[in-house]
Amino acid sequence: MRRKMQARDEEKILVGMDAHSEKLELCVARWTHGSDPVRCKSITTTVDALESTYSKQVPQGSLTLIEASQNTFSIVERLRRIGYEAKVLNSDVLKGMARRDRINDRIDAENLAKAYARGNGREVHVPGEEHREYRDVLFGYFAATKDALRAWNRVWGFCSAHGMKLPKGGRLNSVKDVETALEEAHLTKTQRFVGSMDIEQYKSAMDLKGRFQRQIELTVSKNKDMQALMQILGFRFIVSFALVAFVEDIRRFPNPGKLVAYVGLNPRMNSSGKDEGGNAMTSYGIPHLKALVTEAAQISLRHGEAPMHRWARRKLAEGKPYNKVIGGLARKMVVYAWHVLMGHPAPNCEMEASFTRKLELLGTRIGKDELKAQGFADKRAFAASIACLFYPKTSASTVSHDVCAATQANTGGLCERPAGRLGTPPRDKKS
């Protein structure tokens, strides 16, 4: 107890940082537990001069506090490289701490240190370098998808404005029909030029989207966690990739409810006294991930036969609103994903057939050259080698000795002790 009291009484240096794209404002303050930090000095510098400023003016052993923003993670990584500890606080940590007539970067930097000292700041997880790359690829894919949709809407709008036959769908096959209609339509030279440029923009956007999608598929073909999530009906390459990219380490979430809240699929609570309030879905969470899981829930509702799918259809038959049922099914799928990533046994193996089909499709997408580079003869060998890690029956009946040998070479011998259904951890020899 005395040691704990001494540790609390020790003085610590806090550095509040208000970061912008080019400018940095630092507040170096002394802090003792149980009191507000006392400002020692304020430093104005630039992002390029971060390392030199810290080495000259910030003492070693200090703790830097940064509000979450676009370039926060890169700043934290640079500070850690030169031996400084840094933490990222939630973006709304300064809400209500400053008067409207006293707001500037210096005051915000000082308030960041005060918020942390008072326990008001919620720490934000800083992803590792590999998972930051995953997020960059994912955001690039989302941006390319949005650009492709906008470009297709321009093509559709051009056809509608000039009385041409409206294209159906958004696939490249429809582009050929539009190009044919463009040649046959009675248009001026300028109008044909505008229409052809809209088509070129759409082709370019679809090509960019395809490149990002291939990068995602190549990553999934080499990542065991992403492959394990594909066992869940409705989770294919994009959803599995996105979930692992944001979750990173599943041990950050002690129970599945924490992961559900992280995604943003939990109901909000707003009750006081006799007024219970509403229980609509919270607006917090990760919007992209929430949308992907919700779409996956709609797909699994149409095709799934597992208990959670039968539960959802039963609720619809009872008259429950469709959106609420989809939200509930999406929550169940996230809970399922938590157990899969934790390596817990699954209650059934009904999804083994769809899992194998997804793996074969993944093998088709990455191509024969990539399959040979990974040591597989064809897509069936690729699918069977991965399935044997999760379904022991598959390894005993459908996977040849050569395939298991290739899997051992690629996974470090994991095929010798199959993981079991839906990521069941291998049993210890003593048990």
What are the residue ranges of the model-derived segments?
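Gly/Thr-rich phosphate-binding beta-strand-loop-beta motif of the actin/hexokinase/Hsp70
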Residues: 6-30, 112
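Nucleic-acid-processing active sites and adjacent nucleic-acid-binding tracks
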Residues: 29, 33-62
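Short alpha-helix plus adjacent loop in nuclease-associated cores
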Residues: 87-125, 132, 178, 182, ...
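Low-complexity, acidic/Ser/Thr- and charged residue-rich accessory regions of DNA metabolism proteins
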Residues: 274, 311-431
